[in-house]
Structure formats: C-alpha cells, structure tokens
C-alpha cells in the first residue's frame, strides 16, 4: 500500500509538473483543430464526387487532347500539332503538368481512348472519372496553401483569415468552372496564393519564384506581374530608407545588388528551365499563348467595360434606325467619320459585320461607336495598372501590395482584349485577401463576388446545372458576406461614412436573383414561341450588362479607397 501511495503521489506530482505545458499544448491543438480546413475539404469533395456524372464543357475534350499530345508526341511538336482544333495554348509548365498526368493514366482509361491523338475524342465513363479525379486531387494544393496561410496568421487575425481561406476554398468559381465546366484553376491559383503568403511573410525570393512558376503554368497571371515587379523591386531590391539624390552614383548605391542577383537569378533560372526545351518552336508557342487574331469580346461578353461599350452601340443603333430625329441629333453633336455618314451606311455596317450577338469569336465590329484595336486595350490596361502600382513605390507594405494586385487584375479584366468571363477569378482571389483588413472594403467586395460569380452562370447552360449553380452561389453569398461583416475589423472612420452607396449596392446584389430567374423564364418561353428565337442573345446580354455594372462599380469603389482613403493603408 505504501508503494502504491508513493507511485500515486509521484504520478500526481509529475502530472502537476506537466500540467502547464499540457494545457498549453492542448489549447494549441484545440486551436489548430478549430481553424482546420479538413472538414471543408471532405464536405466539398463529397459534393464534387456527386457532380461527376453531370455536364461538362468542350474544355474536357481540350484537356483530354492535351494529355494525348504531351504523351504521344515529342517536345518539339507539342506547340505545332494541330490534329485537333483544341491545340495546346497554355505555357510549357502546364504542358509538363499534363504530361505528368498522362503517365499515371490507368490501363482501363487508356483502353477507353483517353490518350488517343485524334481530331475528336471518343471516350466513356472511365475517362470522365479519371479526369474529374485529377482536378479534385490537384486542388488539394489549394487547401494546403490556405491552411498554411491560416496557421501562420497572428492570433488576433486568425478568425477573419480562416473565414477568408474557406471563402476561397469553397468559391463558386472553382466549383462551377473546375468541377462542372472542367478546368484546373484550383491548382493554378494555389501557386498564386502561395506567392501571396510568401509576400506576407517577407520571403521575397520565394514570392518571386512562386509567382514565376504560376506564370509558367498560366500566362493570364502576366496581368498581375506589374504589382509583383514593383513590390519586389521596392521591398527587396531598392534601399531607399536614407536615399538622397545628389548624383547618378547615388542610384548605384540605392540598389541591393546581392538581393537583385538572388531574385533575378531564381526568376531567370525558372524561366530558362521552362522555355529552353521549346526554343526551336518559340514563334509557334508565342502565337498560341497570345492569339490577337481573336476578337475584342468573347462569344459571351465578359462583364467588363467592353460589354457596356457593345451594349451602348446596340442601343444607339436601334434608336437611330427606329426613333425619328435621333440620327439628326447625333450628327449635330458628332460629325462623320466618328459616326456613320448616313442611315444607309448604318444598315450596310449591320449587314456586313459581326456585332457580338451571333456567338462568334472572330473580330467584332461596331456600327455606331469607333472600332477598338488591341493597342488601345493594351494602353488602357497599362495606364490603370501604372496608377495601381505607383503607391507601392512609396509604401511597399503587404496591404498596399494586395491592393495593387487586386487593381491590376481589375484593369486587365475590365479593359483587356478578348477577356473570358472566367478571368474574374484574377480579381476575386487577390481581393479576398485584401478584404480582411477593413470593413470599408466590404461593399466593393460584395459587389464583385456577387456579380462576378453570377456572370459565370452562362458557362453552365444545361438545365440540370441550373439549381446547383444558383443555390450554391446564393448560399455562399449569404454565408460569407455575413461572416466577413462580423469578423472583419472596423476602423473609426467607418462611422463617418455616408451609407447611401452601401444600401444601393445591397439593392443591386438582391436584384441579381430576380435577374437570373427572369432570364431563365425567358429561355423557357423561347422554346414555346418561335418569334422569340431571334432574341436568344437577350439572356446573355442581361447577364453581361447587369454583372458588368456590378464589377465596374466595385472597381471604382476600390480605386477610390486605394487612392484617397489614406488611413485605410496605414
């Protein structure tokens, strides 16, 4: 009994000695579990598995063909082969990703025709399952990166950052575009998010390396390059703390040459390893990556400035042809050749050109408004991106960098040439990490996410996809708009704001659902009344214009805060 008592007492003493450490470890473990994305991944994966048998777009055949191209052909023919119309038009690193996937194709999937290099693939359920699973598996990287983002947040920021991380992981864009329409954006944006996390931790070389990898995977990230370039230049390469310009020699000493060599060496090495094997076919590769022969707008107008421009052209054309004296009024204000010289010329232009309502991808011509050239879209994009990156030169903070990154994405989406509606993720993903800083950013963020996600609905035009896309997006907006309102910190200046814009934005967001239901009802009527068949473009136009209003307003709101609300960025 004595020995037993001694053992018990010793155990109690040792337990008391371990107590504080055990409590701390238990609290840390409990906190880790509280902010874990594991349950979200399990639940979302279950939903994605259920969606496997559903609709998929021609992008499924695109990626199947790329598997075949990279598996069957030598390197020098990857960007030359035109057996299928779905030619390889992503950067080489993504081509290597497709090659890696082709190496693990099971025998049953091979026999199903997954790796056949043909003009039009013929495959069945095994190929569908395999390719769907590759999207789900590759998206794991996004969850891992977001978990790192949450775990390495400061304790007081962990809750709001957890909300941001789950909002990105469960984004309707990734569900609709990747797991129904079929693409690999979750994997691609995971690399971009990793570079953002590295920037927050001031690991500048890693940030530059990861962004270079992302760029070599998906060339649309080139639109974000100005923000990365200026941020890394100012934060890592230049030492302007006590800089005083007296002579040009001072500029030499303002450069941290060792840092420049490290960062530049890593970036150039990644680019060299990626593109060097394709040096012999570089012209063909560049032509695939940047096809300026395509038109200003896609077959479905992306909700940007050019959608509104195209809509105004349609309205002016209608008014000048149908309403008396409108043309005379227009010519009294604007003289030819800025507008057509006569009504007959308007009719001739309508008969001759593609005006963006025929679902064609080639160049679009306008009837009333001036024609738009690629050079103009480039200059507009560059102008607004320069405005976005200039503040980073004076304040290379992480907050300024994310604001600049979001506005660079906005500029490219709103004013770029042949922008796809899916490119809205180029804006939403960076903005998601920005909104966590201040409640003043919530209104433009709500406008962007609501209108941006709804603008993706026409991608899934099958009736079976209607309920899932509307219901999932509606639930996401309700949950995350309210969660961010509760968790994002508010500053003192919020109390001095005029809330009319916020209320107007709330009305706009609420009217998105009636717009979607109204367009669906119009589509149902088209099948019953032949007279409505010639107005099939009206539904897509409603999506484009209404969503473009939200995206453009969000851009203007963020631009105002970025350039004129100085306390927000301190």
From Swiss-Prot:
EC number(s) per entry: 2.4.1.265
Record localization: Endoplasmic reticulum membrane
Molecular-function GO term, any one: dolichyl pyrophosphate Glc1Man9GlcNAc2 alpha-1,3-glucosyltransferase activity
Pathway as given in its UniProt record: Protein modification; protein glycosylation
Transmembrane segments: 35-55, 128-148, 162-182, 183-199, 213-233, 263-283, 301-321, 376-396, 413-433, 459-479, 498-518, 537-557
Record family assignment: Belongs to the ALG6/ALG8 glucosyltransferase family.
Function: Dolichyl pyrophosphate Glc1Man9GlcNAc2 alpha-1,3-glucosyltransferase that operates in the biosynthetic pathway of dolichol-linked oligosaccharides, the glycan precursors employed in protein asparagine (N)-glycosylation. The assembly of dolichol-linked oligosaccharides begins on the cytosolic side of the endoplasmic reticulum membrane and finishes in its lumen. The sequential addition of sugars to dolichol pyrophosphate produces dolichol-linked oligosaccharides containing fourteen sugars, including two GlcNAcs, nine mannoses and three glucoses.
Protein name, as recorded: Dolichyl pyrophosphate Glc1Man9GlcNAc2 alpha-1,3-glucosyltransferase
Organism: Eremothecium gossypii (strain ATCC 10895 / CBS 109.51 / FGSC 9923 / NRRL Y-1056) (Yeast)
């Amino acid at each position: 009994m004595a020995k037993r008592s001694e053992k018990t007492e010793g155990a109690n003493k040792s337990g008391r000695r371990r107590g504080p450490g055990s409590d701390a470890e238990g609290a840390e473990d409990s906190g880790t579990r509280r902010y874990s994305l594991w349950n979200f991944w399990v639940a979302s994966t279950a939903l994605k598995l259920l969606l496997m048998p559903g609709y998929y777009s021609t992008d499924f055949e695109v990626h199947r063909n790329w598997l075949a191209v990279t598996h069957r052909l030598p390197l020098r023919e990857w960007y030359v082969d035109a057996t299928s119309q779905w030619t390889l038009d992503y950067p080489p690193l993504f081509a290597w990703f497709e090659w890696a996937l082709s190496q693990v194709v099971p025998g049953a999937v091979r026999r199903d025709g997954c790796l056949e290099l043909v003009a039009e693939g013929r495959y069945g359920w095994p190929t569908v399952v395999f390719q769907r699973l590759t999207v789900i598996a590759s998206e794991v990287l996004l969850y891992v990166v977001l978990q790192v983002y949450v775990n390495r947040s400061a304790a007081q920021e962990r809750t709001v950052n957890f909300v941001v991380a789950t909002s990105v992981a469960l984004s309707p864009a990734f569900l609709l575009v990747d797991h129904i329409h079929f693409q690999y954006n979750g994997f691609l944006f995971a690399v971009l998010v990793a570079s953002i996390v590295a920037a927050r931790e001031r690991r500048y070389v890693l940030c530059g390396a990861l962004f270079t990898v992302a760029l070599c995977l998906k060339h649309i990230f080139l639109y974000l390059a100005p923000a990365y370039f200026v941020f890394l230049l100012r934060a890592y390469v230049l030492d302007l703390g006590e800089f005083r310009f007296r002579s040009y020699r001072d500029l030499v000493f303002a450069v941290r040459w060792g840092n420049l060599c490290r960062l530049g060496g890593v970036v150039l090495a990644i680019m060299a390893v990626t593109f060097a094997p394709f040096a012999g076919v570089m012209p063909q590769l560049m032509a695939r990556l940047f096809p300026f022969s395509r038109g200003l707008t896609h077959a479905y107008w992306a909700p940007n400035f050019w959608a509104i421009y195209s809509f105004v052209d349609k309205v002016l054309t209608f008014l000048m042809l149908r309403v008396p004296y409108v043309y005379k009024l227009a010519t009294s204000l604007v003289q030819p050749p800025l507008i057509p010289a006569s009504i007959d010329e308007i009719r001739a232009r309508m008969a001759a050109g593609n005006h963006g309502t025929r679902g064609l991808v080639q160049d679009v011509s306008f009837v009333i408004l001036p024609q738009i050239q690629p050079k103009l879209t480039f200059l507009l994009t560059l102008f607004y991106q320069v405005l976005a990156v200039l503040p980073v030169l004076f304040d290379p903070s992480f907050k300024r960098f994310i604001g600049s990154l979001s506005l660079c994405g906005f500029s490219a989406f709103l004013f770029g040439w042949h922008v796809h509606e899916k490119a809205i993720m180029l804006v939403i993903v960076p903005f998601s990490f920005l909104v966590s800083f201040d409640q003043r950013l919530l209104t433009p963020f709500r406008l962007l996410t609501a209108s941006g996600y709804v603008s993706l609905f026409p991608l899934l035009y099958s009736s079976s996809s209607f309920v899932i896309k509307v219901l999932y997006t509606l639930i996401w907006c309700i949950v995350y708009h309210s969660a961010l309102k509760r968790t994002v910190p508010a500053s003192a200046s919020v109390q001095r704001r005029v809330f009319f814009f916020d209320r107007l934005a709330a009305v706009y967001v609420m009217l998105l659902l009636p717009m979607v239901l109204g367009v669906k009802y119009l589509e149902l009527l088209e099948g019953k009344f032949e007279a409505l068949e010639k107005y099939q473009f009206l539904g897509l136009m409603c999506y484009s214009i209404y969503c473009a209003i939200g995206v453009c307003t969000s851009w203007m709101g963020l631009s105002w805060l970025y350039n004129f609300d100085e306390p927000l960025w301190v």
